[in-house]
Amino acid sequence: MDNFLALTLSGTTPRVTQGKSAGFRWRWLGHGLLELTPDAPVDRALILSAGIHGNETAPVEMLDKLLSALFSGSLTLTWRVLVVLGNPQALAAGIRYCHSDMNRMFGGRWQSFAESDETRRARELELSLETFFSSGHARVRWHLDLHTAIRGSHHLRFGVLPQRDRPWETDFLAWLGAAGLEALVFHQAPGGTFTHFSSEHFGALSCALELGKALPFRQNDLTQFNVTSQALSALLSGVETSTSFSPPLRYRVVSQITRHSDKFALYMDAQTLNFTAFAKGTLLAEEGDKRVTVTHDVEYVLFPNPSVACGLRAGLMLERLP
Protein backbone atom coordinates (compact mmCIF):
# COMPACT_ATOMS: atom_id res chain seq x y z
CA MET A 1 0.00 0.00 0.00
CA ASP A 2 2.27 2.74 -1.28
CA ASN A 3 -0.37 4.78 -3.11
CA PHE A 4 -2.95 5.55 -0.42
CA LEU A 5 -3.17 9.26 -1.28
CA ALA A 6 -3.39 8.69 -5.04
CA LEU A 7 -6.12 6.07 -4.62
CA THR A 8 -8.05 8.33 -2.27
CA LEU A 9 -7.89 11.34 -4.60
CA SER A 10 -8.92 9.29 -7.64
CA GLY A 11 -11.77 7.56 -5.83
CA THR A 12 -10.28 4.17 -6.73
CA THR A 13 -10.53 1.09 -4.52
CA PRO A 14 -7.31 -0.99 -4.49
CA ARG A 15 -7.42 -4.55 -5.81
CA VAL A 16 -5.88 -5.77 -2.54
CA THR A 17 -7.41 -4.21 0.58
CA GLN A 18 -5.28 -5.73 3.32
CA GLY A 19 -1.81 -7.11 3.79
CA LYS A 20 1.43 -7.24 5.77
CA SER A 21 4.34 -4.86 5.68
CA ALA A 22 7.51 -4.33 7.70
CA GLY A 23 6.38 -5.15 11.24
CA PHE A 24 2.69 -4.34 10.87
CA ARG A 25 -0.55 -5.31 9.14
CA TRP A 26 -2.62 -2.85 7.14
CA ARG A 27 -6.27 -2.66 6.10
CA TRP A 28 -7.93 -0.32 3.61
CA LEU A 29 -11.24 0.58 5.29
CA GLY A 30 -12.54 2.88 2.57
CA HIS A 31 -11.46 5.98 0.72
CA GLY A 32 -9.19 7.99 3.00
CA LEU A 33 -9.28 5.38 5.78
CA LEU A 34 -6.29 3.12 6.48
CA GLU A 35 -5.73 1.05 9.63
CA LEU A 36 -2.21 0.02 10.68
CA THR A 37 -1.68 -2.59 13.41
CA PRO A 38 1.80 -3.57 14.69
CA ASP A 39 2.62 -7.27 14.79
CA ALA A 40 3.68 -6.92 18.44
CA PRO A 41 0.96 -6.15 21.01
CA VAL A 42 0.70 -2.44 21.86
CA ASP A 43 -1.47 -0.47 24.27
CA ARG A 44 -1.45 2.83 22.36
CA ALA A 45 -3.94 3.96 19.70
CA LEU A 46 -3.56 7.03 17.50
CA ILE A 47 -5.88 8.79 15.08
CA LEU A 48 -3.75 10.65 12.54
CA SER A 49 -6.01 12.80 10.38
CA ALA A 50 -5.68 15.51 7.75
CA GLY A 51 -7.73 16.94 4.90
CA ILE A 52 -10.90 17.66 6.86
CA HIS A 53 -10.74 20.81 4.74
CA GLY A 54 -9.84 20.02 1.15
CA ASN A 55 -7.65 23.06 0.51
CA GLU A 56 -5.29 22.24 3.40
CA THR A 57 -2.81 20.09 1.56
CA ALA A 58 0.53 20.38 3.39
CA PRO A 59 -0.52 18.02 6.22
CA VAL A 60 -1.82 15.51 3.65
CA GLU A 61 1.57 15.53 1.92
CA MET A 62 3.25 15.10 5.32
CA LEU A 63 1.12 12.04 6.10
CA ASP A 64 1.86 10.61 2.66
CA LYS A 65 5.61 10.83 3.38
CA LEU A 66 5.15 9.20 6.80
CA LEU A 67 3.22 6.33 5.23
CA SER A 68 5.94 5.88 2.62
CA ALA A 69 8.53 5.62 5.40
CA LEU A 70 6.43 3.06 7.27
CA PHE A 71 5.77 0.89 4.23
CA SER A 72 9.41 1.04 3.12
CA GLY A 73 10.51 -0.21 6.55
CA SER A 74 12.61 2.87 7.32
CA LEU A 75 10.21 3.79 10.14
CA THR A 76 9.03 1.38 12.84
CA LEU A 77 5.41 1.39 14.02
CA THR A 78 4.68 1.15 17.76
CA TRP A 79 1.04 2.40 17.82
CA ARG A 80 -2.22 1.13 16.41
CA VAL A 81 -3.00 3.88 13.92
CA LEU A 82 -6.05 4.96 11.97
CA VAL A 83 -5.00 7.29 9.15
CA VAL A 84 -7.85 9.54 8.02
CA LEU A 85 -7.99 11.78 4.96
CA GLY A 86 -11.13 13.57 5.98
CA ASN A 87 -12.77 14.99 2.87
CA PRO A 88 -11.54 13.14 -0.25
CA GLN A 89 -13.90 14.87 -2.68
CA ALA A 90 -12.89 18.35 -1.52
CA LEU A 91 -9.21 17.33 -1.59
CA ALA A 92 -9.56 16.13 -5.17
CA ALA A 93 -11.32 19.37 -6.16
CA GLY A 94 -8.85 21.57 -4.27
CA ILE A 95 -11.60 23.36 -2.34
CA ARG A 96 -12.24 23.83 1.38
CA TYR A 97 -15.50 21.87 1.27
CA CYS A 98 -18.07 20.87 -1.34
CA HIS A 99 -21.23 21.88 0.50
CA SER A 100 -20.73 22.60 4.21
CA ASP A 101 -17.84 22.75 6.68
CA MET A 102 -17.44 19.23 8.04
CA ASN A 103 -15.49 20.44 11.06
CA ARG A 104 -18.72 21.86 12.51
CA MET A 105 -20.63 18.58 12.15
CA PHE A 106 -19.17 16.05 14.55
CA GLY A 107 -20.89 14.73 17.65
CA GLY A 108 -24.07 14.16 15.65
CA ARG A 109 -24.32 17.81 14.59
CA TRP A 110 -24.32 16.64 10.96
CA GLN A 111 -28.02 15.91 11.49
CA SER A 112 -28.68 19.68 11.68
CA PHE A 113 -27.17 20.31 8.22
CA ALA A 114 -28.75 19.74 4.82
CA GLU A 115 -27.78 16.26 3.68
CA SER A 116 -24.64 16.30 1.59
CA ASP A 117 -21.43 14.39 0.95
CA GLU A 118 -19.98 16.12 4.02
CA THR A 119 -22.79 15.06 6.36
CA ARG A 120 -22.48 11.47 5.17
CA ARG A 121 -18.70 11.60 5.54
CA ALA A 122 -18.93 13.03 9.07
CA ARG A 123 -21.20 10.16 10.05
CA GLU A 124 -18.82 7.66 8.42
CA LEU A 125 -15.84 9.09 10.31
CA GLU A 126 -17.72 8.96 13.62
CA LEU A 127 -18.46 5.27 13.06
CA SER A 128 -14.86 4.62 11.97
CA LEU A 129 -13.50 6.08 15.22
CA GLU A 130 -16.02 4.10 17.26
CA THR A 131 -14.98 0.86 15.55
CA PHE A 132 -11.28 1.64 15.85
CA PHE A 133 -11.31 2.44 19.55
CA SER A 134 -13.73 -0.35 20.50
CA SER A 135 -11.69 -3.04 18.73
CA GLY A 136 -8.63 -2.55 20.92
CA HIS A 137 -7.77 -2.10 24.58
CA ALA A 138 -5.56 0.94 24.34
CA ARG A 139 -4.37 2.49 27.58
CA VAL A 140 -3.30 5.61 25.67
CA ARG A 141 -5.50 7.28 23.05
CA TRP A 142 -4.32 10.25 21.00
CA HIS A 143 -5.82 12.15 18.09
CA LEU A 144 -3.66 14.52 16.04
CA ASP A 145 -5.73 16.37 13.43
CA LEU A 146 -3.44 18.21 11.01
CA HIS A 147 -4.59 21.47 9.40
CA THR A 148 -3.35 24.65 7.80
CA ALA A 149 -4.84 28.09 8.41
CA ILE A 150 -6.51 30.30 5.79
CA ARG A 151 -4.54 33.32 7.03
CA GLY A 152 -0.97 33.94 8.02
CA SER A 153 -0.14 33.92 11.70
CA HIS A 154 2.15 35.46 14.27
CA HIS A 155 2.72 31.81 15.28
CA LEU A 156 3.63 29.70 12.23
CA ARG A 157 2.68 26.46 13.99
CA PHE A 158 0.09 26.28 16.77
CA GLY A 159 -2.37 23.86 18.32
CA VAL A 160 -6.06 24.17 19.16
CA LEU A 161 -7.27 21.87 21.94
CA PRO A 162 -10.94 21.02 22.56
CA GLN A 163 -12.80 21.70 25.78
CA ARG A 164 -12.00 18.95 28.26
CA ASP A 165 -13.32 18.32 31.77
CA ARG A 166 -10.15 16.57 32.95
CA PRO A 167 -6.67 18.12 33.15
CA TRP A 168 -4.45 17.72 30.11
CA GLU A 169 -1.65 15.18 30.51
CA THR A 170 1.76 16.80 30.69
CA ASP A 171 3.43 14.34 28.30
CA PHE A 172 0.88 15.16 25.60
CA LEU A 173 1.39 18.91 25.98
CA ALA A 174 5.15 18.38 26.06
CA TRP A 175 4.99 16.42 22.81
CA LEU A 176 3.07 19.28 21.16
CA GLY A 177 5.89 21.61 22.15
CA ALA A 178 8.49 19.19 20.83
CA ALA A 179 6.53 19.09 17.56
CA GLY A 180 7.34 22.76 17.09
CA LEU A 181 4.04 24.31 18.13
CA GLU A 182 4.66 27.88 19.24
CA ALA A 183 1.27 28.36 20.90
CA LEU A 184 -1.58 26.29 22.33
CA VAL A 185 -5.19 27.51 22.33
CA PHE A 186 -7.59 25.93 24.83
CA HIS A 187 -11.31 25.89 24.04
CA GLN A 188 -13.65 26.46 26.98
CA ALA A 189 -16.89 25.16 25.42
CA PRO A 190 -17.97 22.09 23.42
CA GLY A 191 -17.92 22.24 19.63
CA GLY A 192 -18.51 20.27 16.46
CA THR A 193 -14.87 19.66 15.60
CA PHE A 194 -13.32 16.28 14.88
CA THR A 195 -10.98 16.67 17.86
CA HIS A 196 -13.79 17.53 20.26
CA PHE A 197 -15.65 14.41 19.11
CA SER A 198 -12.69 12.09 19.71
CA SER A 199 -11.97 13.69 23.08
CA GLU A 200 -15.55 13.73 24.35
CA HIS A 201 -16.67 10.31 23.14
CA PHE A 202 -13.49 8.25 23.43
CA GLY A 203 -11.37 10.10 25.99
CA ALA A 204 -8.64 10.77 23.45
CA LEU A 205 -6.00 13.41 24.04
CA SER A 206 -6.79 15.46 20.95
CA CYS A 207 -5.33 18.50 19.23
CA ALA A 208 -5.76 20.27 15.90
CA LEU A 209 -2.26 21.17 14.71
CA GLU A 210 -2.31 24.29 12.51
CA LEU A 211 0.74 24.19 10.27
CA GLY A 212 1.31 27.24 8.07
CA LYS A 213 -1.05 28.48 5.38
CA ALA A 214 -3.41 26.68 2.99
CA LEU A 215 -1.85 26.11 -0.46
CA PRO A 216 -2.59 23.74 -3.38
CA PHE A 217 -0.88 20.36 -3.71
CA ARG A 218 2.81 20.52 -4.72
CA GLN A 219 3.08 24.19 -3.75
CA ASN A 220 3.94 23.54 -0.09
CA ASP A 221 7.37 24.08 1.39
CA LEU A 222 7.36 21.11 3.75
CA THR A 223 10.82 21.98 5.08
CA GLN A 224 9.23 24.61 7.33
CA PHE A 225 7.47 21.75 9.12
CA ASN A 226 10.52 19.48 9.50
CA VAL A 227 10.35 19.69 13.28
CA THR A 228 6.73 18.48 13.22
CA SER A 229 7.49 15.67 10.75
CA GLN A 230 10.43 14.54 12.86
CA ALA A 231 8.30 14.56 16.02
CA LEU A 232 5.60 12.50 14.28
CA SER A 233 8.21 9.99 13.08
CA ALA A 234 9.63 9.71 16.60
CA LEU A 235 6.15 9.30 18.06
CA LEU A 236 5.19 6.50 15.67
CA SER A 237 8.44 4.63 16.29
CA GLY A 238 8.34 5.07 20.08
CA VAL A 239 11.45 7.25 20.28
CA GLU A 240 11.66 10.00 22.90
CA THR A 241 11.41 13.48 21.40
CA SER A 242 13.83 16.28 22.21
CA THR A 243 13.21 18.29 25.36
CA SER A 244 15.27 21.27 24.16
CA PHE A 245 12.41 23.46 22.99
CA SER A 246 10.71 26.61 24.21
CA PRO A 247 7.37 25.80 25.87
CA PRO A 248 4.45 26.99 23.71
CA LEU A 249 2.63 30.14 24.74
CA ARG A 250 -0.85 29.37 26.08
CA TYR A 251 -4.13 31.08 25.26
CA ARG A 252 -7.74 30.40 26.16
CA VAL A 253 -10.84 31.27 24.17
CA VAL A 254 -12.82 34.05 25.87
CA SER A 255 -15.48 34.73 23.21
CA GLN A 256 -16.70 33.81 19.77
CA ILE A 257 -17.73 36.22 17.03
CA THR A 258 -20.67 34.77 15.08
CA ARG A 259 -22.20 36.01 11.85
CA HIS A 260 -26.00 35.88 12.05
CA SER A 261 -27.09 37.86 8.97
CA ASP A 262 -25.95 39.76 5.87
CA LYS A 263 -25.72 42.89 8.02
CA PHE A 264 -22.65 41.48 9.74
CA ALA A 265 -19.43 43.50 9.46
CA LEU A 266 -16.05 42.34 10.81
CA TYR A 267 -13.59 45.19 11.25
CA MET A 268 -10.46 43.27 10.33
CA ASP A 269 -8.92 43.41 6.88
CA ALA A 270 -7.63 40.51 4.82
CA GLN A 271 -4.09 41.09 6.11
CA THR A 272 -5.01 40.65 9.79
CA LEU A 273 -2.88 37.78 11.06
CA ASN A 274 -3.96 35.13 13.53
CA PHE A 275 -2.96 36.19 17.07
CA THR A 276 -3.13 39.91 16.22
CA ALA A 277 -3.64 41.82 19.49
CA PHE A 278 -6.50 44.27 20.14
CA ALA A 279 -6.78 46.64 23.10
CA LYS A 280 -9.74 46.87 25.46
CA GLY A 281 -12.67 48.75 23.95
CA THR A 282 -11.71 48.10 20.31
CA LEU A 283 -14.76 47.61 18.07
CA LEU A 284 -14.35 44.22 16.42
CA ALA A 285 -17.66 43.65 14.64
CA GLU A 286 -21.18 45.01 14.21
CA GLU A 287 -24.47 43.48 13.16
CA GLY A 288 -27.47 45.78 13.23
CA ASP A 289 -27.52 47.36 16.67
CA LYS A 290 -25.20 44.73 18.18
CA ARG A 291 -21.56 45.73 18.71
CA VAL A 292 -18.73 43.34 19.60
CA THR A 293 -15.84 44.92 21.49
CA VAL A 294 -12.74 43.78 23.35
CA THR A 295 -13.62 43.37 27.03
CA HIS A 296 -10.24 42.30 28.46
CA ASP A 297 -7.13 44.47 28.60
CA VAL A 298 -5.75 42.68 25.53
CA GLU A 299 -7.37 40.04 23.33
CA TYR A 300 -5.96 38.14 20.35
CA VAL A 301 -7.95 37.12 17.29
CA LEU A 302 -7.94 33.62 15.82
CA PHE A 303 -9.49 32.49 12.53
CA PRO A 304 -11.12 35.81 11.52
CA ASN A 305 -13.37 35.17 8.52
CA PRO A 306 -16.12 37.68 7.63
CA SER A 307 -17.50 35.57 4.77
CA VAL A 308 -18.62 32.48 6.69
CA ALA A 309 -22.19 31.32 6.25
CA CYS A 310 -24.80 32.82 8.57
CA GLY A 311 -24.83 31.09 11.93
CA LEU A 312 -21.16 30.15 11.81
CA ARG A 313 -18.10 31.41 13.64
CA ALA A 314 -16.45 34.50 12.14
CA GLY A 315 -13.60 34.50 14.65
CA LEU A 316 -12.42 33.61 18.13
CA MET A 317 -11.05 36.03 20.69
CA LEU A 318 -8.33 34.78 23.01
CA GLU A 319 -6.72 35.76 26.28
CA ARG A 320 -3.07 34.99 26.97
CA LEU A 321 -2.48 32.69 29.95
CA PRO A 322 0.43 33.13 32.37
From Swiss-Prot:
Keywords, alphabetical: Arginine metabolism, Hydrolase, Metal-binding, Zinc
Top EC category: hydrolase
Superkingdom of the organism of origin: Bacteria
Any matching Pfam family: AstE_AspA_hybrid
Coiled coil: none
Needed cofactors: Zn(2+)
Residues the record lists as binding Zn(2+): H53, E56, H147
Cofactor stoichiometry and binding remark: Binds 1 zinc ion per subunit.
Substrates-to-products reaction catalysed: N-succinyl-L-glutamate + H2O = L-glutamate + succinate
E.C. number: 3.5.1.96
Active-site residues, as the UniProt record annotates them: E210
Claim: Metal-binding is one of the keywords in the record: yes
MF (Gene Ontology): hydrolase activity, acting on ester bonds; succinylglutamate desuccinylase activity; zinc ion binding
SUPFAM superfamilies in UniProt: Zn-dependent exopeptidases
GO biological process terms on file: arginine catabolic process to glutamate; arginine catabolic process to succinate
UniProt keyword Zinc present: yes
Protein family membership: Belongs to the AspA/AstE family. Succinylglutamate desuccinylase subfamily.
PANTHER family the UniProt entry points to: ASPARTOACYLASE (PTHR15162), SUCCINYLGLUTAMATE DESUCCINYLASE (PTHR15162:SF7)
Function: Transforms N(2)-succinylglutamate into succinate and glutamate.
Protein name: Succinylglutamate desuccinylase
Organism name: Salmonella dublin (strain CT_02021853)
Top-level taxonomy: Bacteria, Pseudomonadati, Pseudomonadota, Gammaproteobacteria, Enterobacterales
Record gene name: astE
